Amino acid sequence: MDDTDLQILSHLQRNGRLTMVELGKLVGLSSPSAAERVRKLEDKGVITGYSANICYEKLNKHVTAFILMEPKSCKHYAAFATSHPDVAENHRITGMYSYVTKVVTESVHTLEDFIDTSMAHGKPTTLVVLSSSSCHPAF
């Protein structure tokens, strides 16, 4: 993987809807060359898919929180989190807690409902997001 591949990844991460013509111009390649590089990155499993960034507030989900969970059973908590509609992400982690769960919900009341329900699976510690900044991993 060379610097051009890293540039391609960076541009696609910011805007996965770029055309190959636009991407080629951004990285100094012809559109067929850019398309070939993208195809190779997909074939190697470096690019695993494309997704949309969602503005949750437009969906009436105004509260984001991270739940640090000490579950009674990792298997049961993972099943609970995976099936809950307010869970955007759930990660198994090391350290004092076993999971960090990103919850996006309508209000503090629905967050409280989630916390109360999650207590059947262990001990949650809740961190409410006040603001966020857009970040992209550096390559």
UniProtKB/Swiss-Prot annotation:
Pfam families: AsnC_trans_reg, HTH_24. InterPro entries: ArsR-like_HTH, AsnC-type_HTH_dom, Dimeric_a/b-barrel, Tscrpt_reg_AsnC-like, Tscrpt_reg_AsnC/Lrp_C, Tscrpt_reg_HTH_AsnC-type_CS, WH-like_DNA-bd_sf, WH_DNA-bd_sf. Keywords: DNA-binding, Transcription, Transcription regulation. It comes from the Bacteria. Residues 20-39 bind DNA. One of its GO terms (cellular component) is cytosol. This is Uncharacterized HTH-type transcriptional regulator YezC. It comes from Bacillus subtilis (strain 168). The gene is yezC.
